[in-house]
Swiss-Prot record:
InterPro entries per the UniProt record, alphabetical: LysR_subst-bd (IPR005119), Tscrpt_reg_HTH_LysR (IPR000847), WH-like_DNA-bd_sf (IPR036388), WH_DNA-bd_sf (IPR036390)
Keywords: DNA-binding, Transcription, Transcription regulation
Domain HTH lysR-type: 15-72
DNA-binding region(s) from the entry: 32-51
Record-linked SUPFAM superfamilies: Periplasmic binding protein-like II, Winged helix' DNA-binding domain
UniProt organism field: Bordetella bronchiseptica (strain ATCC BAA-588 / NCTC 13252 / RB50)
GO molecular function: DNA-binding transcription factor activity; transcription cis-regulatory region binding
Entries under Gene3D superfamilies matching the protein: Periplasmic binding protein-like II, Winged helix-like DNA-binding domain superfamily/Winged helix DNA-binding domain
Name of the protein in its database record: HTH-type transcriptional regulator BbuR
Protein family per UniProt: Belongs to the LysR transcriptional regulatory family.
Length: 325
């Protein structure tokens, strides 16, 4: 195809992708200052770039106030198109730069603490040896946070527990893990028979705050036996719940992988819950449109394969059931 068949007119002034990226961050955070913090720059720089974009388009994109900013009608139209434009440009860059089959660039991956404890020390050195020009940044967070970051394009992939169904996500189940009741080694848990849901109803439970998968499972289980779920403490941080269990304040629920280090160190003991349904599924997720990127496909396949291999070799705490692969 000849260049004149698709080239823009010589006097056309195309949009700057940097300005579009800044616009997306301001739209997401609804704040010039928070967008500046996310992008590692100053608020005046963000303000100038949004001003340049508005001047280029000839419309106002935000309505500012003391509380932040909201999109105008024109801004709403742009936010509906800008992320996909930026992704397409990223795909073009990857396809061109990788035309010689060199795996390079950078990707961000998320992982829950339970999986990170087992896999991060294994994955990162192998990735570095296999693809020395590929930089992989790993962040650890709660499953709910990881889902949001994948959907927003901040993470290329994530390994987490039981993501909710979403049309923009591709979910790849990896392992089914049984939940455990976790407590201090000097607690009654040491001599307790495998604890049932009815047993849990009589214990001082410290649980994740509402909306997290373990909390949701327990709420459903307690409803089935007509018992109210009344934890003595709630926290969004699994690390905080673990530490409170170490101190003997109460009991919490985690996977074997999530407490393997503390159990090995003698800080905690764990008993698997035998009740049906007291399981979670470790799942790898990617955004549907991101799977067109070769690096995302390569890393996703590798991570999924390694996690399943570790479990099949009996090296994953609790001996979870391997799914797929």
């Amino acid at each position: 195809m000849a260049a004149e068949d698709f080239a823009l007119p010589a006097d056309h002034n195309p949009l700057d992708t940097d300005l579009l990226n800044v616009f997306c961050w301001v739209a997401k955070t609804q704040s010039f200052s928070r967008a500046a913090a996310e992008l590692g720059t100053s608020q005046p720089v963000i303000t100038r770039k949004i001003g340049r974009l508005e001047e280029c388009l000839g419309v106002a994109l935000f309505v500012r106030s003391n509380r932040g900013c909201v999109l105008t009608a024109a801004g709403t139209v742009l936010i509906g198109k800008a992320p996909s434009i930026l992704l397409q440009l990223a795909e073009i860059k990857e396809e061109v730069s990788h035309s010689a089959s060199v795996v390079s660039g950078s990707l961000s991956m998320g992982i829950t603490h339970a999986a990170s404890t087992v896999m991060a020390p294994r994955l990162l050195p192998v990735i570095a040896r296999r693809w020395p020009k590929l930089q992989v940044d790993v962040m650890e967070a709660l499953s709910r946070t990881l889902v949001e970051r994948v959907l927003h394009g901040e993470l290329a992939l994530a390994v987490l527990f039981d993501p909710p169904p979403h049309p923009d996500l591709i979910c790849r189940p990896l392992l089914i893990e049984r939940l455990c009741l976790v407590g201090n080694p000097q607690s009654d848990l040491r001599t307790m028979a495998p604890p049932t849901i009815r047993d849990l109803a009589r214990l001082p439970l410290m649980l994740p705050s509402g909306g997290q998968i373990i909390r949701n499972l327990l709420e459903d289980a307690f409803a089935e036996i007509n018992e109210p779920l009344k934890p003595v403490y709630e926290a969004a941080s699994m690390a905080m719940l673990r530490e409170m269990a170490v101190q003997g304040i109460g009991y919490t629920l985690l996977t074997q992988g999530g407490v393997a280090e503390d159990v090995a160190a003698g800080k905690l003991i764990a008993q698997a819950l035998p009740d049906k349904g007291m399981v979670v599924t470790l799942t790898l997720i990617t955004k549907r449109e991101s799977t067109r990127l070769r690096n995302v496909r390569l890393l996703s396949d590798f991570v999924a394969s390694e996690i399943r291999a570790v479990a099949r070799q009996g090296q994953w705490p609790g001996h979870p059931t391997v799914v797929g692969g």
